[in-house]
Amino acid sequence: YIDAGGRLDRGGRTELAMQCSVYTRTGIERIARAAFEAATERGRLVHNVTKSNVLSYGATFWDEVVKEVAAEYPDVRLEKLYVDAANLSIVSQPERYDVVVAPNLFSDILTDAAAGVVGGLGLAPSANLNPDADVPGMFEPVHGTAPDIAGEGIANPLATVLSAALLFEDLGESDAADVLRSAVETQLG
């Protein structure tokens, strides 16, 4: 997210607010390549999720660049979805999905919905990876921390443990990742 936009006539009858989204070819190509690389090792399907039917500049540009990158991966299928339809089907047909590429706002929406399928945010790990690998990734539960429930003894730490498993996997320590996943499975019964 970026802080581009503004508000005019605060509190007035003609109050106006505008929030801009910024997409760069470099950024889109980078995340799209990471998605297609992941798909070559997995199910060979990438879902591209935007709202280009109404966001005719940024989202359309995103779709065009993802399609260009897809041409570099002829063995990987690309399926385009609008975020509203994807949000419904990620809950009703989660088995359809393996690799999803989407702008940050839509990804945030989809990860919340997908977390509900697996038992909630307390069970949803995430990895923010740098495809260039010149800086380390960040591994945390989907949407990070929950400061609103700090100290109440009700936070579920399992997403943190599963995020650590993703970290170990990224480091090439698959045995350690398996131990953590097994421990979570044991806890869940």
Task: List where the protein language model places each region.
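A generic local structural motif
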Residues: 85-89
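A glycine- and small-aliphatic-rich helix-loop capping segment at beta-alpha/alpha-beta transitions
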Residues: 6-11, 64-69, 118-127, 131
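Glycine-rich phosphate/nucleotide-binding loop
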Residues: 90-179, 183-188
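Short amphipathic alpha-helical segments, especially helix-boundary/capping motifs
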Residues: 8-13, 40-44, 137-142, 158-160
